[in-house]
Amino acid sequence: MNYITFPTAQSAVEKIAQEFVIYSQANHPVHISLSGGSTPKLLFKTLAQAPYADAINWKNLHFWWGDDRMVSPTDPESNYGEVQKLLFDHINIPAENIHRIRGENEPHLELKRFEEELSAVISDGVFDWIILGMGADGHTASLFPNQTNFADENLAVIAKHPESGQFRISKTAKLIEQAKRITYLVTGEGKAEILKEIQTTPAENLPYPAAKIQAKNGVTEWYLDKAAAKLL
């Protein structure tokens, strides 16, 4: 497990924000996939403020999501809605650079539409950077233990939360693994035990998608705060 430990969650998201600045200076479109969850909210708030809001050339960055819940963008559960509220409403970014999963649509129709958009915009299926979180059960995006097909050749999949039954659309494991770079952003002592397990046990012996999904031809790294890394 290739990991970097930061003193706090804030210092981890500052590092990611600094890298957004660097990515945005490339003179070509850069495709970044975002994650939902509490730590990414910290990232979006940080990006919306000085110095990052002005230092980033937003027109070069295209944003996607690892997954989203099938709810309206105004619903508090919407991953896209959180980013809109915390970041997009505060910066000048072209509307065509935002590639959201339309959670208000019927799931099967939206799956088809989203896959078509992915194919049209990123024809080789290779994202520049995919930022992922990890749940306490080891899920990532909406790829859950014991129900993820790691061989699924599609670009996206309809997933169902194992407890709530809520529908989501998620990138598939295979699409994520094509990325040039995958960064798992994991914070808080609630994740310490599972991180220790991932570090000490071969991925094939674990049920956790976050342990198994790694960039095939790129870099996979874990950004952890001190609390999450305390058992490593």
Predicted feature descriptions by range:
Residues M1-I32:
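N-terminal glycine-/serine-/threonine-rich phosphate-binding loop
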Residues A26-P51:
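Glycine-rich N-terminal segment of FAD-binding domains in flavoprotein oxidoreductases
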Residues L34-T39, L132-A136, T187:
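Glycine-rich beta-strand-to-loop/alpha-helix junction loops that act as flexible
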Residues T46-I56, G81, P145-E153, T201:
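A glycine- and small-aliphatic-rich helix-loop capping segment at beta-alpha/alpha-beta transitions
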Residues I56-D128:
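Ligand-binding beta-strand-loop-alpha-helix segment within the catalytic cores
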Residues L111-K112, A141-N146, I194-I198:
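A short secondary-structure junction signal
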Residues I130-K174:
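Class I SAM-dependent methyltransferase SAM-binding "motif I" and its flanking Rossmann-like core
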Residues K180-L232:
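ATP/nucleoside-binding phosphotransfer catalytic cores, i.e., glycine-rich phosphate-binding loops
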